[in-house]
């Protein structure tokens, strides 16, 4: 029987690659729900191809356009209620959450409450509400399956030996500016930051990779996925991006997961788990690779990584504030209103003004998110 999946963010980078995986295994999947943001035309094309029972797009006007284009036979929704409709669609066995930012939080919670497994490509959900979401999943008996390449790698290294793991290692490409001086970083333009050396991603996550904030967010995500303390989560720069994650075992052994830099691999494993299916992707040629190198992150120039560790250790609503302030700062940078080196300054200034609330409920998290966005916007105006 095919696995029935719903996809939030089907027109984005991860969503499109997930549908590529479905096309590679048409007998093993049935797409029952699709949700997109503003690209209603691509959503309509996807719906015509996969014939889901429900689709959603952000605006009501676009929803009407989709309705007219498809001509019936599918429920069409809009906005946040639309995301919820797709996330809780009764026919779905598993939900792939591939929307950006905190937009994915509420539908992820709703999917877990409805008893669905979640393939999570939206790291912000665990960053801002890791304690709440993991406790809820445990209580409902559902699985959170990591899609990020680094977390998928660690997951595969630790799957059957959790009690033997003493630490995890996340690798980072280092981004396009890992050898830049402070003066060169101050001159970075948005178009420079959007040229990632190894991965094909959306603009926000590409900038986060350049600042190392993406790796910082992944550290917080790893804390909740693998139940490890921050002192046991390491970050190492690995420019070749062949080793995606490692696990340290209690006898000193280190297990590493290596694969080509193609997101369809971790996407497929999350959707096929516990099975592992064949792919048509090229295998690693170690002789052609020649060497694998590792470096220590330059924390003096890329302070976002330490800000993430700080927020994670403080806990409560502080990781939510870190994430929201970063989203505001990155948006200002992409719009040309903020310098690249001011992104972590805006985040730090926002965190300094926040008094974290312990064990927050969903409402507390959403309130902290709104406060942080307003505070970060004001901070961005001051430093620009």
UniProtKB/Swiss-Prot annotation:
**Where does the chain bind Mn(2+)?**
148, 150, 218
One Pfam family here: DXP_reductoisom
Gene Ontology biological process? isopentenyl diphosphate biosynthetic process, methylerythritol 4-phosphate pathway involved in terpenoid biosynthetic process
Which terms are listed as keywords in the entry?
Answer: Isoprene biosynthesis, Manganese, Metal-binding, NADP, Oxidoreductase
Q: Which organism is it from?
A: Desulforudis audaxviator (strain MP104C)
Question: Can you state which reaction this protein catalyses?
Answer: 2-C-methyl-D-erythritol 4-phosphate + NADP(+) = 1-deoxy-D-xylulose 5-phosphate + NADPH + H(+)
Q: What does this protein do?
A: Catalyzes the NADPH-dependent rearrangement and reduction of 1-deoxy-D-xylulose-5-phosphate (DXP) to 2-C-methyl-D-erythritol 4-phosphate (MEP).
Major enzyme class: oxidoreductase
Name of the protein in its database record:
1-deoxy-D-xylulose 5-phosphate reductoisomerase
Give this protein's Gene Ontology molecular function annotations.
1-deoxy-D-xylulose-5-phosphate reductoisomerase activity; manganese ion binding; NADPH binding
């Amino acid at each position: 029987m095919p696995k029935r999946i719903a996809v939030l963010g089907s027109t984005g980078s991860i969503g499109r690659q997930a549908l590529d995986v479905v096309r590679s295994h048409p007998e093993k999947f049935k797409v029952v729900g699709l949700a997109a943001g503003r690209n209603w035309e691509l959503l309509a094309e996807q719906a015509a191809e996969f014939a889901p029972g429900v689709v959603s797009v952000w605006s009501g006007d676009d929803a009407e356009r989709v309705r007219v284009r498809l001509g019936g036979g599918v429920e069409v929704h809009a906005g946040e209620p639309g995301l919820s409709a797709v996330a809780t669609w009764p026919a779905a066995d598993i939900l792939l959450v591939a929307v950006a930012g905190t937009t994915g939080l509420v539908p992820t919670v709703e999917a877990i409450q409805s008893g669905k497994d979640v393939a999570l490509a939206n790291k912000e959900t665990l960053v801002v509400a890791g304690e709440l979401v993991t406790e809820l999943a445990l209580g409902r008996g559902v699985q959170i399956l990591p899609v990020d390449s680094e977390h998928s790698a660690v997951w595969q290294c630790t799957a059957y030996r959790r009690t033997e793991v003493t630490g995890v290692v996340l690798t980072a490409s280092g981004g396009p500016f890992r050898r830049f001086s402070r003066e060169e970083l101050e001159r970075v333009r948005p178009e420079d930051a959007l040229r990632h050396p190894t991965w094909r991603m959306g603009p926000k996550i590409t900038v986060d990779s350049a600042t190392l904030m993406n790796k910082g967010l992944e550290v917080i995500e790893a804390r909740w996925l693998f139940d490890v303390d921050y002192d046991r989560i390491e970050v190492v720069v690995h420019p070749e991006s062949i080793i995606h994650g490692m696990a340290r075992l209690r006898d000193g052994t280190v297990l590493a997961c290596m694969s080509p830099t193609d997101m369809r691999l971790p996407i497929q494993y999350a959707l096929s788990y516990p099975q592992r299916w064949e792919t048509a992707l090229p295998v690693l040629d170690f002789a052609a690779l020649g060497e694998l190198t590792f470096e220590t992150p330059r924390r003096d120039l890329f302070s976002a990584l330490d800000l993430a560790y700080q927020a994670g250790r403080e806990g409560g609503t502080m990781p939510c504030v870190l994430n929201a302030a970063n989203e505001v700062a990155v948006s200002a940078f992409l719009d040309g209103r903020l310098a690249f080196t001011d992104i972590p300054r805006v985040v730090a200034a926002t965190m300094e003004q926040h008094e974290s609330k312990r064990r927050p409920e969903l409402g507390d998290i959403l309130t902290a998110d709104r406060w942080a966005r307003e505070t970060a916007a004001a901070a961005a105006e001051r430093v620009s």
